[in-house]
């Protein structure tokens, strides 16, 4: 049975992506990013109409992925080291410097609760487009936890793959193994045309 609603972002994970020698992709094992508060990713792309005979004769549509923000309680140290490329010194202090670095690409996995079953997602080719802001405020009469926000870009991989999500017909093993490894679709001869 299909969900009617979704709510409650949870189980955010990231898995670093690498290019393989044969031109493919591989992913490390997904690692949790605890403390998810909010995820907002806007679709990017264009439609370009071509007019002929007094009508829209053809319309080209492009899918340029997504961009937006992931708000979490705190960016984990492992994420700062492996993806933001901060360096831990001999005293265990994370150091950020202005050296030019290539962005680290990763898959972002997450889910929303549904009224029947959680909906699991994977964005295949993400990068951080800006470092988290450093901010805080004084404690007043009550403690209000602060959050940190990562600005993300989710582009298509070179093979065109952008994202996948589970649905009501998802095979149970695929659903249960979602966070064990990054799900990559199986392409059948029928699907290739």
Task: Describe the predicted segments one by one.
Residues 15-16, 108, 192:
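Intrinsic disorder/low-complexity segments
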Residues 20, 89, 157:
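Acidic surface patches and DE-rich sequence motifs
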Residues 28-33, 120-126, 163-168:
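Short amphipathic beta-strand/extended segments with alternating polar/hydrophobic composition
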Residues 58-124:
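Structured, beta-strand-rich domain cores
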């Amino acid at each position: 049975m299909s969900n009617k609603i979704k709510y409650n972002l949870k189980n955010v994970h990231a898995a670093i992506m690498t290019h393989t020698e044969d031109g493919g992709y591989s992913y490390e094992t997904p690692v949790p990013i605890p403390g998810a508060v909010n995820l907002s990713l806007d679709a990017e792309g264009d439609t370009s109409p071509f007019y002929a005979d007094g009508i829209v004769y053809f319309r080209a549509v492009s899918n340029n992925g997504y961009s937006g923000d992931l708000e979490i309680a705190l960016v984990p140290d492992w994420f700062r080291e492996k993806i933001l490329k901060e360096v831990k010194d001999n005293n265990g202090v994370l150091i950020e410097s202005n050296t030019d670095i290539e962005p680290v690409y990763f898959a972002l996995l997450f889910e929303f609760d549904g009224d029947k079953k959680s909906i699991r997602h994977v964005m295949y080719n993400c990068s951080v487009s800006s470092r988290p802001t450093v901010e805080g405020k004084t404690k007043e009469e009550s403690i209000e936890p602060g959050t940190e926000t990562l600005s993300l870009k989710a582009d298509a991989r070179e093979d065109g793959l952008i994202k996948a999500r589970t649905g009501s017909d998802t095979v149970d093993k695929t659903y249960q193994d979602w966070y064990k490894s990054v799900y990559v679709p199986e392409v059948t001869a029928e699907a290739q045309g």
